[in-house]
Amino acid sequence: MKNLIAELLFKLAQKEEESKELCAQVEALEIIVTAMLRNMAQNDQQRLIDQVEGALYEVKPDASIPDDDTELLRDYVKKLLRHPRQ
């Protein structure tokens, strides 16, 4: 029983570490996208936003991915492009 608990705690710690790594990657990408957008001319910024939103619109939904997840992704991309970090 102790071994099982120890193994579960170890797996939980691994998952937490993976989660932290993913969060750091997302934060880094947000910073990069924000910096790029801020350094672009307004018309170039708008062209990029239109291209990204167009690409997202053209992607066919995957039946294995819940609609809520797809909508969450689209909302987050829109927020990142239209209202970058301060």
Curated annotation (Swiss-Prot):
Any one Pfam family match given in the protein's UniProt record, by short name: Anti-adapt_IraP
HAMAP family cross-referenced by the UniProt entry: Anti_adapt_IraP (MF_01198)
Family membership: Belongs to the IraP family.
Functional summary from the UniProt entry: Inhibits RpoS proteolysis by regulating RssB activity, thereby increasing the stability of the sigma stress factor RpoS especially during phosphate starvation, but also in stationary phase and during nitrogen starvation. Its effect on RpoS stability is due to its interaction with RssB, which probably blocks the interaction of RssB with RpoS, and the consequent delivery of the RssB-RpoS complex to the ClpXP protein degradation pathway.
Complex formation: Interacts with RssB.
Coiled-coil regions listed in the entry: 1-36
Coiled coil found in the keyword field: yes
Name of the protein in its database record: Anti-adapter protein IraP
Major site of localization recorded for this protein: cytoplasm
Taxonomy, superkingdom: Bacteria
Any GO BP: cellular response to starvation
Swiss-Prot/TrEMBL keywords: Coiled coil, Cytoplasm, Stress response
Species this protein is from: Escherichia coli O1:K1 / APEC
Keyword Iron listed: no
InterPro entries documented for this protein: SigmaS_Anti-adapt_IraP
Compartment annotation: Cytoplasm
Recorded GO CC terms: cytoplasm
